[in-house]
Amino acid sequence: MASASLQTEISKFMSYVLRHAPHEVGLTLDPEGWVPFEDLKKAVFTRFDVTDADVLEVIETNPKKRFTLMGDRIRAAQGHSVDVDLALAPATPPSQLFHGTTMESWTAIQNAGLKKMQRHHVHLSADTETAKIVAARRKGVHIILEVEAARMHSEGHSFFVTDNEVWLTDHVPSQYLSPISGAES
C-alpha cells in the first residue's frame, strides 16, 4: 500500500495528465476525455514505483473523487483545460449552490460574475462545507458565495452535475451571487 503522501502525488499526477497534458505522457483522450486504464497505469508506473493495487486505491479512496473508472477506461471527473465533452445531461440544480473564493477575488466577481477562466465550466458545490474546502486551496481571506441556482435555471442558464457531485455552469452573473454572512474561513 502506498503512503498517504505518495497517494497524493499519484493523484495529482493523474489529474494533471487527464485534465491538462495527456500528450506529455503519450496519451490521447477520446472526445469525452476517456483513455484506456492500462495506458494511464503505464504512465504512472514510469513515474512511480507502485503496483496496480496502489493505483486502484488512489482512484477508489480519493476524497475528491477526481476520477471516473468505467470498465477498462478512466477519465477526470471535471476540471479539464484540454478540449473534451463530458457528455453530461442538463440537470435541475437545488435552490442554492455555493462557491468558495477569496475576498480579493470577490471584488472582481461583483463586477463580472463567476467566469470559467481556463476551464470549460464554473465549478459549484452543493454545500457550504465543500465550498469552504475549495476556498481553503486559495491564499487570502476566504469567503463563501451563495448562488441562486434555481433562479438562474428558471431564467435559462444550464447546469450539469458530474459523477462526483460537482455542479457546473458556463457563467454565474453577479446578480445571482451573494456572500454568506459569517461564512468566512
Curated annotation (Swiss-Prot):
One of its GO terms (biological process) is tRNA splicing, via endonucleolytic cleavage and ligation. Keywords: NAD, Transferase. It comes from the Bacteria. Pfam families: PTS_2-RNA (PF01885). Disulfide bonds: none annotated. It is an enzyme of class 2 (transferase). One of its GO terms (molecular function) is NAD+ poly-ADP-ribosyltransferase activity. InterPro entries: Ptrans_KptA/Tpt1, RNA_2'-PTrans_C, RNA_2'-PTrans_KptA, RNA_2'-PTrans_N. Its EC number is 2.7.1.-. The keyword NAD applies. NCBIfam families: PRK00819.1-2 (NF002013). Belongs to the KptA/TPT1 family. Removes the 2'-phosphate from RNA via an intermediate in which the phosphate is ADP-ribosylated by NAD followed by a presumed transesterification to release the RNA and generate ADP-ribose 1''-2''-cyclic phosphate (APPR>P). May function as an ADP-ribosylase. This is Probable RNA 2'-phosphotransferase. The lineage of its organism: Bacteria, Pseudomonadati, Pseudomonadota, Alphaproteobacteria, Hyphomicrobiales.
